[in-house]
Amino acid sequence: MAKNSLVIGGGVIGLSSAICLLEDGWDVTLYSTEFSPNTTSDVAAALWYPFLSAPVEKTDNWGSRTYDILKLLTADENTGIDMTQTFEYFRNEQSDPTWMSTVD
């Protein structure tokens, strides 16, 4: 029996997620009010990382897989995806996030 999924969003994350699910044998329905070239992904920069996600044992894994896919997409200039090092500044000292070791 086929696994069914609904992906909401036609931007980079939504489309990438839909492709991964299809490649894994899922039946995918994609819903979005806009598609390229009218998505936020087409005109805006994005900051991506697993944010306030749990359980860590699972989210670090999917975060790492997502990062790897986004990194692959940077090889094709037609995707418009570029990775840039960023810095976050906090008022108080923060410990490194659990997912930090899963990215380069």
Where are these regions (language model features)?
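Glycine-rich FAD pyrophosphate-binding loop
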Residues: 23-42
